[in-house]
């Protein structure tokens, strides 16, 4: 049985690679996320605040096998200089957990790196499309595989936003069968000190 930390790690990261294996980088190849354009004139100040995770497109085997364990997930973002301090909240066995991360500045607005203790190397993240007020589409890459996430400020989700997300998923060479939709109820926003995972580099 997976430990609570392991379950949180996989469900929060939701990348499409096997994190326990080292992926060889083909000579002369480019990183998949390098072809993804960040939101034009991205503003961390406008992006700050609360986001609700709606769906993830990924070929991750863990998602296919453990998707039934998905829980409502909330993300809080706050600018920290050129970086962003991020806290993710979700329940596990009825208890609210918090994962703290720092999305580090890469020098390109809308592009970030963050560290995860169980991953081999940094995770790349791009805010590809957002209107700041209603939705945001994020790409993550670890192990040279992409996952696509849809966040919203509030529910329900506009059909036009879902159309944009599904198009982005297809463009990432993923199928609709590889989309996991998260619960729309049961969100939590606070965790006690015993249920906080701190992934911020020290």
UniProtKB/Swiss-Prot annotation:
Residue numbers of Pyrrolidone carboxylic acid PTMs: 21
Disulfide partners: 96-188
Carbohydrate attachment residues: 41, 158, 173
Family: Belongs to the calycin superfamily. Lipocalin family.
GO BP annotations, alphabetical order: complement activation, alternative pathway; complement activation, classical pathway; killing of cells of another organism; positive regulation of immune response
GO molecular function annotations of the record: retinol binding
Protein name: Complement component C8 gamma chain
Cross-referenced InterPro entries: A1-microglobln, C8G, Calycin, Lipocalin_CS, Lipocln_cytosolic_FA-bd_dom
Organism of provenance: Mus musculus
Keywords, in A-Z order: Complement alternate pathway, Complement pathway, Cytolysis, Disulfide bond, Glycoprotein, Immunity, Innate immunity, Membrane, Membrane attack complex, Pyrrolidone carboxylic acid, Retinol-binding, Secreted, Signal, Target cell membrane, Target membrane
Keyword Glycoprotein part of the UniProt annotation: yes
Gene this protein is translated from: C8g
Subunit structure: Heterotrimer of 3 chains: alpha (C8A), beta (C8B) and gamma (C8G); the alpha and gamma chains are disulfide bonded. Component of the membrane attack complex (MAC), composed of complement C5b, C6, C7, C8A, C8B, C8G and multiple copies of the pore-forming subunit C9.
Compartments, record wording: Secreted; Target cell membrane
Listed SUPFAM superfamilies: Lipocalins
Cited function: Component of the membrane attack complex (MAC), a multiprotein complex activated by the complement cascade, which inserts into a target cell membrane and forms a pore, leading to target cell membrane rupture and cell lysis. The MAC is initiated by proteolytic cleavage of C5 into complement C5b in response to the classical, alternative, lectin and GZMK complement pathways. The complement pathways consist in a cascade of proteins that leads to phagocytosis and breakdown of pathogens and signaling that strengthens the adaptive immune system.
Pfam families: Lipocalin
Main location: secreted
Regulation acting on activity, per entry: Membrane attack complex (MAC) assembly is inhibited by CD59, thereby protecting self-cells from damage during complement activation. MAC assembly is also inhibited by clusterin (CLU) chaperones that inhibit polymerization of C9.
Signal peptide bounds: 1-20
């Amino acid at each position: 049985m997976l430990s609570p930390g392991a379950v949180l790690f996989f469900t929060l990261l939701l990348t499409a690679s096997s994190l326990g294996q080292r992926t060889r980088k083909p000579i002369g190849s480019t990183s998949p996320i390098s072809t993804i354009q960040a939101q034009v004139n991205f503003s961390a100040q406008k992006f700050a605040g609360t986001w609700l995770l709606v769906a993830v497109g990924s070929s991750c085997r863990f998602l296919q096998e453990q998707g039934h364990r998905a829980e409502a997930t909330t993300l809080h973002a706050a600018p920290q200089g050129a970086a962003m301090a991020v806290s993710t909240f979700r329940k596990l066995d009825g208890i609210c957990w918090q994962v703290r991360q720092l999305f580090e500045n890469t020098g390109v607005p809308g592009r970030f790196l963050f560290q995860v203790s169980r991953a081999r190397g940094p995770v790349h993240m791009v805010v590809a499309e957002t209107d700041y007020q209603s939705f945001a589409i994020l790409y993550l890459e670890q192990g040279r595989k992409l996952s696509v996430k849809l966040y919203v400020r509030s529910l329900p989700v506009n059909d036009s936003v879902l159309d944009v997300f599904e198009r982005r998923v297809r463009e990432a060479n993923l199928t609709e069968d590889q989309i996991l939709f998260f619960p729309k109820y049961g969100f939590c926003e606070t965790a006690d000190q015993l249920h906080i995972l701190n992934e911020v580099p020290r």
